[in-house]
């Protein structure tokens, strides 16, 4: 920056607002490139050398045949599906597995961890189902 441009900047009303934005003016975490990471290095001769390992690679899935749209309008009506309850979740996920094991004859009350259940809730901060356990 030249001397004349610095002097001209000083005469302008609001000279502090006209100052060049540098890392000295921003917070401690301010980086001049606004969050973009460098993709290479600058040599002593001020030449930029890109480094392939520093360039991010994006893995984009194949969306061929994908039916959902990328945008959902705010004008869409509210959903009609009821909110998920623990009983509904149990009936949809765990109950069919237990019923299948009973039909096959391999169900055991000692092996409830197989279905994602816990034998006791000792040591838990919150008792999830207090009706099922003696107080």
Swiss-Prot record:
InterPro entries, A to Z: Ribosomal_mL41
Key words, A-Z: Apoptosis, Cell cycle, Mitochondrion, Ribonucleoprotein, Ribosomal protein, Transit peptide
Interval spanned by the transit peptide: 1-13
Compartments (UniProt record): Mitochondrion
One Pfam match: MRP-L27
Superkingdom of this protein's organism: Eukaryota
One GO CC term, this protein: mitochondrial large ribosomal subunit
Record flagged with keyword Ribosomal protein: yes
GO biological process, one term: translation
UniProt signal peptide: none
Gene Ontology molecular-function annotations: structural constituent of ribosome
Residues annotated as transmembrane: none
Subunit record text: Component of the mitochondrial ribosome large subunit (39S) which comprises a 16S rRNA and about 50 distinct proteins.
Homology family: Belongs to the mitochondrion-specific ribosomal protein mL41 family.
Stated role: Component of the mitochondrial ribosome large subunit. Also involved in apoptosis and cell cycle.
Annotated protein name in UniProt: Large ribosomal subunit protein mL41
Gene source species: Danio rerio
